[in-house]
């Protein structure tokens, strides 16, 4: 019987054997089931980072498994070890977004200045992890991924619910949401760079006006 190890990139994933008259067979490699560590979890994040980056820079059409593997600096077999298909890559990206949204909503609800101020001050694109993952996910909507649409809708609804709890009025909460969307869009017009810094003084003025509106609404004024 002739045998050889299949490795990724230095770890034995499986051992392929060939017995004359029978054909190829596989048996678990010692590193996979014999106590050694499989490819490190960091490699999975590296692949997701590459997928995210390609989506942002080139759109969905350029995110083939081969392209993602090249961008991540891994073999295609290494990519498939973590993500067996392109749909699995998308699921991984959406799972990352849900985790980041959990963290962001927790920060929003615990912010000393309150959810409204936190939401407005973080609405401008800052190249934070959640910013990048959100932009990447929106690129997937170009081909109507229903699962992506559901996750994005859930993320935005959680921001809305946090604002609604803070201000107590659905219309006011929605207005604040739309102002945040507008601030993000305005940032993208700054030389086409969504990460370009915006005028902080203007942001402060927008926040002041919104806070006045919230106070007036709470007091029952028009």
Language model: regions and residue ranges:
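Helix-turn-helix
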Residues: 46, 54-88
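Short, intrinsically disordered or compositionally biased N-terminal tails of bacterial proteins
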Residues: 1-38, 222
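Hydrophobic/aromatic-rich alpha-helical bundle segments in the mid-to-C-terminal region
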Residues: 128, 146-153, 157, 161-222
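Hydrophobic alpha-helical connector segments
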Residues: 99-137
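Short amphipathic alpha-helical elements of helix-turn-helix/winged-helix folds
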Residues: 50-54, 122
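Short acidic/histidine-centered micro-motifs embedded in hydrophobic/aromatic stretches
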Residues: 122, 137-140, 179-183
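Alpha-helical DNA-contacting segments of helix-turn-helix folds
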Residues: 90-97, 148
